[in-house]
């Protein structure tokens, strides 16, 4: 697949032939103790994500430390490649307006020669072909790292400079649209978060009162004797078919002791994950009955719309932590100990007027529906880019 107007064979080159620099940084002497609130940006592997340089949770080093690490100073248009750990193979191009930064030993700097376009080369790294190359080059007993010699030896098919630019421009356009979509989704998430914050902390509202969860929820004690399909619960997808979400079933052969979930029920996982060290709390929007792990708490609702409000409230990890941390005991291997009865005993500030309950639920659900539409657009853009990369870099 090629754009119209371009002819001639692509050349095969080793990366070392088209790069002026292939090396990484190091941990500064003194490690994290030398990090400062201001100074020179110090890039770590977590900053190289989603084909871009993400500067959330950035750390900095003093100018004096940066001067001791001159060989790993980062410039605009450098390619950054993660070369160790779980994020191995992730890469990005340093933005045009980037000022100055440095990297640690887990991030490789690839600085290309003048006739080669980093915004053409980096998408090859992100493509299916590129990821396969990195997987094949991993070294060590656990196959967990890339060395510089193997990176330099990577062979790439490359067109002339003007065709590189054409492809890079097209991919940059898709990336800009992906970035815009991500911002739209983030704004909708912040809107839900802000509304919940405002509503749940307005103690002057006479239509709200402090209630325990057992006033609005009741433990559902129904076992899976009818062998319903086993589902999991995730932060982003909520209650979802286990095979669809995880690729295979992790359920026991006999699931008759699993808990049954009805449409509208609240499910509490009681297991730590990511930003939710005390577990996830989600409402099920699956019309049919499903089964979940016997470790999960399942609660039937006295009012669907109230449970829906709780679903949105507990989508914020801070709210989950504030509600659960005083009633949970953590055991060995980070296990969580809490009874379903204890879960229901704590109190929250909740609406009491039926019309307001439904109104709040409808508002939050409308924003969530808009977010779902925008996420589908984002998924289509990502698939478009993936398809183009597969066709271009077979």
Which role fits each region the language model picked out?
Residues 46, 105, 122, 131, ...:
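Glutamine-centric residue-chemistry signal
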Residues 16-31, 46-76, 214-228, 234-266:
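Sequence-specific dsDNA recognition surfaces
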Residues 100-108, 139-162, 289-295, 328-355:
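A short glycine-rich beta-alpha junction/loop motif
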Residues 44-45, 56-128, 259-319, 339-340:
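A short beta-sheet element
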């Amino acid at each position: 697949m090629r754009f119209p107007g371009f002819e001639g064979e692509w050349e095969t080159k080793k990366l070392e032939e088209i790069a002026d620099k292939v090396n990484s940084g190091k941990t500064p002497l003194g490690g994290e103790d030398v990090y400062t609130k201001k100074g020179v940006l110090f890039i770590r592997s977590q900053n190289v994500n989603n084909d871009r340089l993400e500067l959330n949770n950035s750390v900095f080093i003093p100018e004096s430390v940066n001067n001791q690490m001159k060989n790993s100073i980062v410039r605009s248009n450098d390619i950054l490649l993660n070369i160790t750990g779980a994020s191995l193979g992730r890469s990005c191009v340093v933005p045009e307006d980037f000022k100055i930064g440095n990297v640690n030993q887990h991030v490789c700097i690839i600085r290309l020669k003048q006739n080669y376009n980093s915004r053409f080369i980096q998408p090859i790294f992100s493509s299916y072909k590129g990821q396969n190359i990195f997987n094949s080059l991993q070294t060590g007993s656990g196959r967990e790292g890339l060395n510089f010699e193997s990176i330099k030896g990577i062979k790439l098919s490359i067109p002339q400079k003007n065709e590189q630019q054409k492809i890079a421009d097209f991919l940059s356009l898709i990336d800009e649209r992906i970035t815009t979509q991500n911002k739209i989704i983030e704004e909708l998430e912040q809107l839900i978060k802000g509304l919940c914050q405002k509503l749940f902390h307005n103690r002057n509202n006479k239509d709200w009162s402090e209630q325990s969860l057992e006033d609005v929820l009741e433990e559902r004690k129904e076992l899976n004797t009818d062998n319903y399909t086993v589902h999991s619960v995730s932060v982003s997808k909520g209650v979802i078919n286990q095979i669809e979400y995880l690729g295979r079933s992790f359920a026991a052969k006999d699931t008759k002791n699993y808990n049954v979930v009805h449409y509208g029920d609240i499910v509490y996982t009681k297991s730590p994950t990511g930003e939710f060290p005390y577990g996830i709390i989600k409402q099920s929007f699956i019309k049919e009955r499903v089964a979940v792990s016997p470790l999960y708490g399942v609660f039937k609702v006295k009012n669907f719309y109230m449970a829906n409000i709780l679903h949105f409230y507990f989508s914020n990890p801070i709210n989950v932590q504030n509600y659960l941390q005083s009633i949970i005991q953590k055991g060995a291997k980070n296990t969580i100990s809490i009874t379903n009865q204890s879960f229901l005993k704590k109190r929250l500030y909740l609406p009491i007027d039926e019309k307001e309950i439904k109104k709040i639920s409808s508002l939050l659900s409308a924003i969530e529906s808009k977010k779902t539409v925008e996420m589908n657009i984002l998924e289509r853009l990502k698939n478009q880019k993936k398809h183009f990369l597969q066709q271009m870099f077979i």
